Amino acid sequence: MNTIWIAVGALTFLGLVFGAILGYASRRFAVEDDPVVEKIDAILPQSQCGQCGYPGCRPYAEAVGLQGEKINRCAPGGEAVMLKIADLLNVEPQPCDAEEQQAAPVRMLAVIDENHCIGCTKCIQACPVDAIVGATRAMHTVMSDLCTGCNLCVDPCPTHCIELRPVNETPDSWKWDLNTIPVRIIPVEQHA
C-alpha cells in the first residue's frame, strides 16, 4: 500500500515541478504580438476563406499590419471592413477589388444535393465557419445563416454534389444593418 502512495506522491511532485518549469518558460520566452495586428485581426470576419490570397484572417492581418499589404482584399468583409481598417491605420480608404466593385454583389450559398451525398464529411472538414452539419454516412446540409460562400467545400466533395448558388434577397434573408438605417424620433402630442 505504501508503494502506491509513494508513486502517487512522486507523480504529483513531478507534475508540479514540470508545471512550474513550463509556467516559467512560457513567461520568460513569450513573444509579444503587435497590437496593431491584433486589432486588425479582430476587425476581420474570421471566415478563414482564403479569398484574400492568404491562408486565413490572421496571416492577412499580419501582412496588412507588418508588410503594408492592401487593405481592400477581404471579400467577405467588403467595404465595411476595409473602412474600419483604414480608420485604424489612418490611411486613405481604397476601392475594393474588381470582384467587389460590382453594382450589386450577389451573396452565394453552398447547396448540397442530398440525393447524391454519401456522408464522407470532407465538406465539413473543409468548411472554415462550420456551416455544414451532418454525420458520417448520413445526409449533410448547409446552414444558410453561417455560410459565407467561400467555395472551399466544393472541391473536396468526391461526388460533386455541392454547388454555389446565388441567394435571392427577400425581406427574410436580407441582413438588415440597423446601425446604418437613420432613425428619427417623431414627437407625439399626448391628449388627456
UniProtKB/Swiss-Prot annotation:
Annotated positions binding [4Fe-4S] cluster 3: C127, C147, C150, C153
A single GO molecular function term of this UniProt record: 4 iron, 4 sulfur cluster binding
Residue ranges occupied by any 4Fe-4S domain in the UniProt entry: 32-91
Residues given in the record as [4Fe-4S] cluster 1 binding sites: C49, C52, C57, C74
InterPro entries recorded: 4Fe-4S_dom (IPR007202), 4Fe4S_Fe-S-bd (IPR017896), 4Fe4S_Fe_S_CS (IPR017900), 4Fe4S_Ferredoxin_RnfB (IPR050395), Elect_transpt_cplx_RnfB/RsxB (IPR010207), RnfB/RsxB_Proteobac (IPR016463)
Compartments, record wording: Cell inner membrane
Keyword Membrane set for record: yes
All residue ranges annotated as the 4Fe-4S ferredoxin-type domain in the record: 108-137, 138-167
Gene3D superfamilies in the cross-refs: 3.30.70.20, Electron transport complex subunit B, putative Fe-S cluster
Entry superkingdom: Bacteria
Required cofactor names: [4Fe-4S] cluster
Keywords: 4Fe-4S, Cell inner membrane, Cell membrane, Electron transport, Iron, Iron-sulfur, Membrane, Metal-binding, Repeat, Translocase, Transport
Pfam families membership: Fer4_21, FeS
Residues binding [4Fe-4S] cluster 2, per UniProt: C117, C120, C123, C157
EC numbers on record: 7.-.-.-
Cofactor note: Binds 3 [4Fe-4S] clusters.
Cellular component, GO annotation: plasma membrane
GO biological process, one term: electron transport chain
Chain residue ranges for the region called Hydrophobic: 1-26
Similarity annotation: Belongs to the 4Fe4S bacterial-type ferredoxin family. RnfB subfamily.
Function: Part of a membrane-bound complex that couples electron transfer with translocation of ions across the membrane. Required to maintain the reduced state of SoxR.
Quaternary structure and partners: The complex is composed of six subunits: RsxA, RsxB, RsxC, RsxD, RsxE and RsxG.
PANTHER family: ION-TRANSLOCATING OXIDOREDUCTASE COMPLEX SUBUNIT B
Protein's name according to its UniProt entry: Ion-translocating oxidoreductase complex subunit B
Species for this entry: Salmonella arizonae (strain ATCC BAA-731 / CDC346-86 / RSK2980)
